[in-house]
């Protein structure tokens, strides 16, 4: 979430810094981390439900997802709809249609709502993956996800649209990122039984691996090579990094990830992500960076405690503890 917000900063006082850092492509990396974590968590929850109850309830899953995601999301769309006639945003009423139906990863929308493409990809994943697990089982679904990882680089090369950056936002070219997280959840225990994997994951030099992959990606000017190879490698390294710090949260990084402020920020992260674009990339007003950041976290905190939390309590009452999120 922080990486994405940093990539959206467009203020005069920070423009030199952000333009210098942009070459690291940290915004896209932040979204990839989010997708891998999402695939891992959702698959883990569904597998826990299967183990606990003997089955996966599609109805229960969609109720839980709706209560978790939609209240705050549609509150954002409602606020933008009210702001349009007041000329507080650049968006038009037509820009609300694609986000309303979670398809803004295929249609270009105004700057204030452009970030909803990632939530559209996420929602499309929710529609497909639980059904795969129910119809085909965990093992065959995992094999299907693995096959998709193999063909995704080819899809990224073929899916080029000069009028809109479809390659970066389309479900078919981004789903392998989520699938990597799904495979981590499915094969995590089996991977841990491999001594080679354990040694790599627990090596003191392991934290240098993600950085090395990012540096390598920066140095490759050939877009075809990037699409065919490095993106997939980056997805795998993100998954390995998640596994590493879940199993062995030691050192400065582990301490930071488990610190109180970071844990609190993690619980709050959905709301800042929802509201950041309205302030950081407002098409009509360019507010000072500090004002925008304070406004984002004030609105996000209100959204979390007033809108999200009541629905989260309802979600928790509808679900066994083992399958809550």
Predicted features by range, described:
Residues 1-48, 70-72, 101-104, 121, ...:
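Functionally critical transmembrane alpha-helices in membrane proteins and complexes, commonly lining
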Residues 2-10, 82-85, 103-106, 148-158, ...:
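Aromatic-anchored segments of alpha-helical transmembrane domains
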Residues 2-6, 40-44, 78-82, 123-138, ...:
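Membrane-interfacial alpha-helical segments at the cytosolic side of multi-pass membrane proteins
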Residues 19-31, 90, 109-121, 160-180, ...:
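Interfacial loop-to-helix transition and helix-capping segments at the boundaries
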Residues 28-31, 48-83, 98, 120-126, ...:
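Transmembrane alpha-helical segments and their boundary/interface "anchor" motifs
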Residues 43-51, 82-86, 134-139, 183-193, ...:
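Structural signal for the C-terminal ends of transmembrane alpha-helices
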Residues 123-151, 185-204:
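Solvent-exposed interhelical
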